[in-house]
Amino acid sequence: MEVRRGDGSVFRGVLMPKHETSHPDTVVIKLGNGYNIGVLVGEGDDIVVKGSLRPGTPGALVPLLEEPLQPAEERVYIIGAGGTIASRVDYETGAVKPYLDASELATTIPELQRYASIEAEQLFSILSEDMKPSMWEAIVDRAARVLEAGYDGVVVAHGTDTMAFTASALSFAFHKGLPSPVILTGSQRSSDRPSSDAAFNLTASVLAASRAPFAEVAVVMHGETGDTYALAHRGVRVKKMHSSRRDAFQSVNDKPLARIYPFEGRVEMLRDDYRRRGESGLEVDNGFEERVALVKHFPGLISEVIDALLDRGFKGIVVEGTGFGHVSSDAIKSIERARDQGVPIVITTQTVFGRVNLNVYSTGRKMLAAGAIPAGDMTSEAAYAKLSWILARTRELEVVRKMFQRNLAGEVSERHILRLYRHIGGV
């Protein structure tokens, strides 16, 4: 359709439903560049209908290549687990909803075939806030079957908000042996938006899955706000550090594994202490305990929160303490109660960077005496997934403590390196 204004300006595009709060004389149009505008129609303006589209017609995901590519010899399997990368805007409500499946993503981004022959399936169609430990198990099972079938790598398309939890969980499930990369990726902006990062991230992920020399669980997302390179972060070391930026994901207390250049077809390793592709077979240790909680210490009723979780039968609790990992004096009594009930209390720090040290102040020493388990420099996401994984294998408190203090998948460092702290002060 066209809106022809009395001043001679013309707006062309597809008529979209308007929001319930829009002015009654406003027309919402999706322009050819993918952006929506609202045009206030008044006297002297004309609306010309040029044609119609069937509801559900795919939007901005348009193949960029005029001629089809010959698929590469490598084989990569894409597992769809929902999230923004497989979503689009619902123009009736203005909200982002799950819409596309993994096969649609693969077919609408033909550049993927430069690096691998693609097969895909949709395992879940959810937004990532609905992810659960039982779904981690399903992803592990499916990825394991794919790798057993001889694929060169696996890509899991996942929502970004809880991706670090899932990446950590998969890292522990595969920590005993992984022959090829398992890559998690997503997008900060839905696939039907012109500013979407879906195609770039998915292409970089397929490149990593098919040709990267490492055989680990990793998250591959934009490394900067442009479209130059993506970063591959070790699954147990990554965290989403910004709500909306393309380069929201960072490695915490650790270096990324690699830079991925999807337009050049190049993988630049940033470290050499990684598990090599093909040097080990597949060994899966799947299973997670769902009754694990993650709570943040705050000035107030933290002891009552811990007590309530114990009363409700939770099997383990991760507490984000302040600074070195401290909690209030009242909460120490709750840690003692948890120990007496055989429930592990793991301590991480709210500061994100740095490590838990309960040997500096008297509060920390009292916490250790009460039974708290320090998580070192683990992220809270990794600590949560690790505790969930351990509790699916044993409930004996001392065994849990010993297993938690073992470095299974590179989730903790023996010493802290100051230069790994990324200053984000803006100056």
From Swiss-Prot:
NCBIfam families: asnASE_I (TIGR00519), gatD_arch (TIGR02153), PRK04183.1 (NF003217). Keywords: ATP-binding, Ligase, Nucleotide-binding, Protein biosynthesis. Its EC number is 6.3.5.-. It catalyses: L-glutamyl-tRNA(Gln) + L-glutamine + ATP + H2O = L-glutaminyl-tRNA(Gln) + L-glutamate + ADP + phosphate + H(+). This is Glutamyl-tRNA(Gln) amidotransferase subunit D. Belongs to the asparaginase 1 family. GatD subfamily. Transmembrane segments: none annotated. PROSITE patterns: ASN_GLN_ASE_2, ASN_GLN_ASE_3. Heterodimer of GatD and GatE. One of its GO terms (biological process) is regulation of translational fidelity. Allows the formation of correctly charged Gln-tRNA(Gln) through the transamidation of misacylated Glu-tRNA(Gln) in organisms which lack glutaminyl-tRNA synthetase. The reaction takes place in the presence of glutamine and ATP through an activated gamma-phospho-Glu-tRNA(Gln). The GatDE system is specific for glutamate and does not act on aspartate. Residues 74-407 form the Asparaginase/glutaminase domain. The active site is at 84, 160, 161, 240. The keyword Transmembrane helix does not apply. It comes from Aeropyrum pernix (strain ATCC 700893 / DSM 11879 / JCM 9820 / NBRC 100138 / K1). InterPro entries: AsnA_fam (IPR006033), Asp/glu_Ase-like_sf (IPR036152), Asparaginase/glutaminase-like (IPR006034), Asparaginase/glutaminase_AS2 (IPR027475), Asparaginase_C (IPR040919), GatD (IPR011878), GatD_N (IPR040918), GatD_N_sf (IPR037222).
